[in-house]
Each structure stands twice: as structure tokens, then as C-alpha cells.
Amino acid sequence: LMSKIRHQTIADLRAEGKEYVPHQAESVIDWMLEQNRAGKAAGKGFYEYPKEGKKFLWPGIAAIYPPAAQQPDVDEVKKRLLYVQAVETVRCLEEGVVTEPADADIGSILGWGYPAWTGGTLSFVETVGLKAFVAECDRLAAAYGPRFEVPASLRERAAKGATFYPAPAAGQRRSAA
């Protein structure tokens, strides 16, 4: 499925006259396909799907991707997962893929399982505070690469003290989307 999505994405971008920028994780997908491990529908992918019993991680993945000698801090991994998804959501808002912050929040929770306790990706950014979020993304980008770089629109919004949701009137609470 991932391969089909990639090929369609490339075709769509070319049709729009845009350039496709490959992601570093694509080499993993390509390698898995070379190993004839196309996924659950094929009966094997990152996981083994025995007819009897529970699925389990395919041990062969460690042949090319062995565990690192030094494992990252769990809290840092959690932060990276939350922040990179929030940054991508801001990009989607900037590009018009989604037009309403509430739609982005609901979609992130119900669509792909972003943690509900955050209120959604954009609510997470607002809870952290836009300036603090941008500063932390700058730190993450310096440590882990450009996927954490925030769009200029978010940096500008943070500098102006703006938010994604309007502030409630005095004495009122923001209602749920």
C-alpha cells in the first residue's frame, strides 16, 4: 500500500508541475518489498501474521536495522512523535489541505490516533504555547533534522502572540469543537 501511495503521490505532483521530495524512510519500504514483505494483506510485512496466535515483529528486520547501541530517552522520543505530527499539521493548514483548526484537531485524534489528551495537534501547540513550541522545534531541528523546522507562518504567528483559535470573551470558556 505504501508503495502505491508513493507512486500516486509522485504522479499527482508531476501533474501539478511540482517536485516530489523523497523521504528517508522510503528505503525501508523498498527493502521490505525486495524481501517480499508487502504487508498484512500479503501475510507478512513488518510483522509475522501466524494463522494461529498473535502477530509479532518480524525478526529479520534487525538484520538491516539492528538496535542502536545507545537507545534514546523515552521522553525525548515521545516529544519527537508529538511535535513532528503537530508541525506537519501546521503545514497542512498553511497549504490549505485542512482549513479549520478544529477539523485538524479532530482529524488528528480520530484519523490517525494522535493522543486524545492533547486535544489534537493544534490544541497541543496552543497548550505548549506557540513561542515555546517554536523554540522546542528549533532545538529538535538542530538535534534531529529539518522535519522539525516550523513553517514561517507559525513563527510569525508566535511572534505576534496569535493563536489558532480565537480567545474566548472575558468570563467565557472555549467550547469544544
Placement of each model-derived feature along the sequence:
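N-terminal glycine-rich phosphate-binding loop for ADP-containing cofactors
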Residues: 1-177
